[in-house]
Amino acid sequence: MRKPELLVPASSLEVLKVAVIFGADAVYIGGEVFGLRAKAKNFSMEDMKEGVEFAHAHGVKVYVTANILAHNQDLEGVRAYFAELKEIGPDALIISDPGVYRIAMEVCPEIERHISTQANNTNYGTYQFWYEQGAKRVVTARELSLAEIKEIREHIPEEMEIETFIHGAMCISYSGRCLLSNYFTGRDANQGACTHPCRWKYAVVEESRPGEYLPVYENERGTYIFNSKDLCMIEHIPDLLDAGIDSYKIEGRMKTALYVATVARTYRKAIDDYLESPKKYEENMEWYRDQISNCTYRQFTTGFFYGKPDHESQIYDSNTYVKEYTYLGIVGEKDEQGRYTIEQRNKFSVGEEIEVMKPDGDNITVTVKGIWDDEGNAMESAPHPKQKLWIDLGVELDKFDILRRKEME
């Protein structure tokens, strides 16, 4: 049985390093252009170079998204961008547009080419076509069942790889080809600027009563008719393996380091446990469920994997996340006094109980003993986001440990 790759997103250099440390086999990132995530922090060329070097030093691959649906005016920019990427040396480019693919073949043929889910890859004929064009991997359309993916595996060359999203947010539109954002706001989802109108509240209009807007109530908060639950396949690793999927992809190029660390660590352990012993995987199932629920999410569904989703896969009464923990920061360097630096993300205080999340699966509850600013002044709390601080938690920490606080129920 071929060990599947765990492919994790990263919105920034910091998050890439966390993904690597917390168990990713590969990380996918976007540059400042052509990557379909205009709102993400994204990577400068300098950060991308450092990220690729860091990942490769830890035996982890890096894939760069270039899955924009390009217009004529984009093509020369794509060519220049790929020439720069050639010097950096990522392991693959993720592409959906045939014109962009053609440029990649011309400019950097030595870099693997993976076909994005945006290309609507729903059948083995599509896979065979892209294989003939030299693609190493194709990402399945979100609308495929495990049975369909298994059939694709049976009809394509063994060396061709199948990548599938197994966790994260679900777009209500067909493989993400949505026009709602463009229609409502002029921001094109296929150019990376989606405003997520699927999460908004809607009313209906009866055609003979123009101007009369009728709310469709589920309860006092209204209804969110396009609002999908999040995909989660942590309980179905055996079925993913049986389908012949080579790469298990986590959605989330706009997520925090806490989210990425939590999901990467949980799936890393689940995959490794099952390959070691299916019994061990079953015995640890409650731990996986508990851990995967510790990051922000919108309730869970298995999507299309076991057939077309029904009403149970939608959230009708809210567009809000479930939030179990608050992200406080990432542990950095240690000073001579045994304090550790962090760039804090949310407020915490001296005397407060927080958790240290470690890559090996341990969560350590600690009390904040002291907080100092970068000039050495003692502080009672950390109220300013992104402020550099020094902290004493009374325990030994490691670089890239994650600090979080459990929210009150």
Residue ranges and their predicted role:
Residues 64-65, 95, 115-117:
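Short beta-strand elements of ligand-binding domains
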Residues 76, 113-122:
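Gly/Gly-Pro- and Ser/Thr-rich, intrinsically disordered tail segments characteristic of DNA damage-repair
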Residues 108:
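Conserved phosphotransfer cores of two-component systems
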Residues 99-100:
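Alpha-helix capping/helix-boundary segments
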Residues 1-10, 15-21, 26-33, 51-52, ...:
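Surface-exposed amphipathic alpha-helical tracts and adjacent flexible/coil segments at the periphery
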